[in-house]
């Protein structure tokens, strides 16, 4: 993996990352900034996998491949239970990172989710019925989920049973509740960092 302080040109980014299919390289050439953020999401998925399996015999260490693409590792090419979890976690990580980058204004292709509202509260802290106030820029979760689908599902072949299982696991990871829980979990961890 490249040091985080090195910024790569878009064409170089797409050429240096190993394990991409021709279709993913095409997506990379169309939106290199978003793909770079997607790889941050994949690395986030690897870290979360290591955290979840830290006390198990298999602890995601095989995902630490020379490229920044955990999908290039051998475990992701097989139908193990762990790889099912990793597909879901990867899809959620990409959706999370892209949604967050949208909210931070780091991507040209998207912006804030216009639904950045929160319930208005009275002086005692109770939510007022049907009263909303603007709370700033929220994560553009819909864009993150769509990009995750566009970038990760394109590597799967239509007729292959394992590919259908992988897409199913990707969809499970992209379920809104899963991604929102990941957002909440990671946001709370950042407060302590």
Model-derived features: positions:
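Long, position-biased, composition-driven segments near the start of the mature protein
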Residues: 1-193
